[in-house]
């Protein structure tokens, strides 16, 4: 029988990544990384890339990536797939919460 892991994110403490950016690590094991990322209005996550694919699901607010169609806005329910090696960053005018899924291998 498999053990089902669960986390109540409402009971977790947000960890500061950089000014205006916080995270809750949901899963971090070799080859597995699941993170809730909360970005304050007017703030952003620095440009970066990964040697593996990176996936983003927008849960709340407006997520903007200046590298996608010149800064396209993505609302709740939007899904983005970044192929391995793709540089990207995140900004928001409203504040946003996203779920990030990757293999935790920085480029």
Specify the residue positions occupied by each region the protein language model found.
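A short, N-terminal "cap"/entry segment at the start of jelly-roll beta-barrel domains
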Residues: 1-31, 36
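Conserved short histidine dyad/triad with adjacent acidic residue
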Residues: 27-50, 64, 83-85
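Glycine- and acidic-residue-biased ligand/ion/polar-headgroup-sensing regions
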Residues: 50-68
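Short acidic-glycine-tyrosine-enriched beta hairpin
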Residues: 67-85
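Ligand-binding loop in jelly-roll beta-barrel domains
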Residues: 84-107
